[in-house]
Design a protein with these regions (language model features):
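Positively charged n-region of N-terminal signal peptides that target proteins for export
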Residues: 1-6
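Short metal-coordination and nucleic-acid-contact micro-motifs, chiefly zinc-binding Cys/His arrays
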Residues: 37, 327-333
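Beta-propeller blade termini and top-face loops
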Residues: 223, 228-246, 250, 276-319
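Bacterial N-terminal signal peptides
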Residues: 7-17
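Primarily short, surface-exposed interaction patches in extracytoplasmic proteins
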Residues: 143-179, 183-218, 232-281, 343-344, ...
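Solvent-exposed helix-loop boundary motif
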Residues: 20-158, 174-179, 189-197, 236, ...
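Short cysteine clusters
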Residues: 41-44, 334-338
């Protein structure tokens, strides 16, 4: 061990070079150190206190520098030669080396040097970037002043100049019109549309193209397809017989919401709690009910003899995973059976989030009698808690059809007699024709008059317990009330918090006790991915400890704040992105650029990616 200490001292004293940027800068905790600890150490020495080994916790600085069960100190700030962590990662004895061989994790020499260098610098910790509110960064100064179209380009060009790179040339007009039409509508431009764009010599021809595409119903459908994938929309129940259920009115509402450019904060509240908040000024009375069908978008079982408590636990967990993933960019589902091993979510946090959804009436979605009934489980669109919904855009058409059907019914005689008996009666052929027309009209009317699985709140929400190890049969866990994750603050809602309180918290500013800026960051990152093929943080569904650092953190922060500043206007954010010169760059890259930046993290060119399956199919 003495010789090992000498090796460690030598490593630190010599200041051996570390590859990449880390060699030129002091180690940054979030950029350089946290990824090493998270991937290799936190599973046993992280937030999960129940599975923590040796009393050592490395995700918290105070705990990491404290003496542990063995009497050693894993980290002695400024003294890597006295830090047990440095000794263990350089140990060759399989019984004492860290990470242990059975973990199949092996640190590289560069990673070991980084850890030693970081401890020598005082072992400074930083909060995880995703839980620090975005800052209003000013774009960096650039040498080239005539390149960009908006502030996005200033951030991109500033980074490229710092890296000694230049942006790619603009894409040719045909490539550009195809790119933006695919990205904004999910469809290719027609030959006539391409020709029209090429023939348009106005300076604002591209802006006119963007405005036309953004106002198109096809753009609303494209954005709806993106959203419906996130919220796991499906026309069937998912389990066992995979029977159909009529959830399509929710899909139509999502399309209309994007067509009407509903602000994303309202879009959020209506889906999570439309049944609780009701319509706002200017909204159709049916819209909250249509939007609240989001809460019914989950796999459901129609199996005979199901265990009610089991599936109630399954449904609850599904809702928690989706809400936390879509709006928070978090893997809270990892805390279903134990405290999260990489992020500060506890099992109590998991079930407390689930308690928000304990008021949803799922009882009649499951047959408690122990067998499947056609009018109950196999056909979930004809059972309570459901309501008959006529979409706001179909109401006039429904009234028109009702009037026509009533008129035809009055025209038809109750009995057809020979023409010579009652000459004033219509001919049989006329009656048949009217009957056929009546059947057609009734079919059209029935297509409008649909039933939709919506959310109905129970007068008394169900009791929710923490399930030890996620076991639905274990009822020894503590009863939890609906609340937000502890490390994110206190909801401070009067009375029992509801889904409406949760939705409001997700879009309320941090200064007012919410996490609106965090939600905006997750959403802006996803929207960027639509236009560039990948997010500025590439792990778009996981901004936590196992996710990636953003390649352009200042740009991502600015996008987040711009989304809020615009009134949560998604269409404006899309317009800002696709009108940037960065978006309009060619995706071609010379060999030297591909060798240096094969994944296009620096944005010296446009990205290349496969079209979504929906686009290929529709094309």
């Amino acid at each position: 061990m003495h010789s090992l200490r000498l090796i460690v001292v030598a490593i630190v004293a010599s200041g051996l070079a570390v590859s990449g940027q880390a060699a030129e800068k002091a180690p940054d905790f979030n950029r350089d150190i946290r990824p090493i600890l998270s991937r290799n150490c936190f599973a046993c020495h992280g937030p999960d206190e129940h599975d923590r080994r040796g009393g050592l916790r490395l995700d918290d600085r105070d705990a990491a520098i404290t003496e542990v069960d063995s009497g050693a100190r894993a980290i002695v700030p400024g003294r890597p030669d006295e830090s047990e962590l440095v000794a263990r990662i350089n140990e060759t004895d399989p019984d004492t080396t860290m990470p242990p061989p059975e973990s199949n994790h092996v640190l590289t020499a560069a990673q070991k040097q980084l850890l030693a260098k970081w401890i020598a610098a005082g072992a400074p910790y930083s909060p995880h970037w995703a839980y620090v509110p975005p800052h209003a960064h000013a774009p960096p100064a650039t040498k080239q002043v005539d390149w960009g179209n908006n502030w996005i380009d200033e951030f991109v060009l500033g980074r490229l100049e710092a890296e000694g790179l230049a942006p790619a040339p603009d894409a040719d007009p045909v490539t550009l019109v195809r790119r933006v039409t695919f990205d904004l509508t999910g469809l290719p431009p027609t030959p006539a549309e391409v020709e029209a764009y090429l023939a348009d010599t106005r300076p604002d021809a591209y802006m006119s193209l963007i405005d036309r595409l953004l106002a198109s119903p096809r753009h609303a459908e494209r954005m709806a397809a993106w959203w419906l994938d996130l919220v796991r929309y499906a026309d069937t129940v998912g389990y066992h017989g995979d029977q159909p259920h009529n959830i399509s009115p929710y899909r139509d509402w999502v399309i209309k919401a994007f067509l009407d450019n509903v602000p994303f904060d309202r879009f959020t509240v209506l889906q999570l709690a439309g049944d609780l908040v009701g319509p706002a000024a200017g909204e159709h009375p049916d819209e909250p009910a249509l939007a609240s069908a989001y809460n019914r978008l989950l796999q459901t079982t129609h199996e005979g003899g199901l265990q009610l408590k089991e599936y109630r636990a399954i449904y609850q967990a599904d809702r928690i995973r989706n809400v936390s993933g879509v709006w928070m960019g978090a893997t809270v589902g990892c805390a279903q059976c134990h405290d999260h091993k990489y992020d500060p979510y506890t099992s109590r946090d998991f079930y407390a989030l689930g308690a928000f959804f304990a008021d949803i009436d799922d009882e009649k979605h499951m047959d408690k009698a122990g067998f499947s009934r056609q009018n109950l489980n196999a056909t979930p669109t004809v059972r309570e808690p459901e309501i008959k919904v006529v979409g706001p855009f179909d109401r006039d058409r429904a009234a028109e059809l009702d009037a026509r059907i009533h008129s035809l019914e009055n025209e038809l005689p109750p009995l057809v007699l020979p023409p010579w008996a009652q000459p004033e009666q219509p001919e049989p052929e006329t009656v048949v024709a009217k009957r056929l027309e009546l059947e057609r009209l009734e079919a059209d009317r029935n297509a409008i008059d649909r039933k939709l699985m919506v959310t109905r709140a129970l007068a008394e929400p169900r009791q929710v317990r923490l399930l030890p190890r996620g076991n639905w049969m274990d009822e020894t866990g503590m009863v939890v009330q609906p609340t937000i994750p502890t490390f994110l603050g206190d909801l401070s809602a009067p009375g029992r918090p509801t889904r409406a309180d949760l939705a409001a918290w997700l879009v309320r500013p941090v200064a007012q006790g919410g996490v609106g800026e965090f939600t905006a960051r997750v959403t802006a990152n996803r929207i960027w991915a639509i236009c560039f093929g990948t997010g500025l943080c590439r792990s778009v569904g996981d901004l936590g400890g196992q996710g990636e650092l953003p390649d352009h953190p200042e740009l991502l922060d600015r996008l987040s704040l711009e989304l809020i500043r615009s009134g949560w206007n998604v269409r404006d954010l899309v317009r800002t992105i696709v009108t940037s010169r960065a978006y309009r760059m060619s995706s071609d890259a010379p060999a030297d650029l591909l060798a240096r930046d094969p994944d296009n993290r620096l944005l010296a060119r446009q990205g290349r990616w496969r079209l979504p399956a929906e686009n290929v199919r529709d094309t």
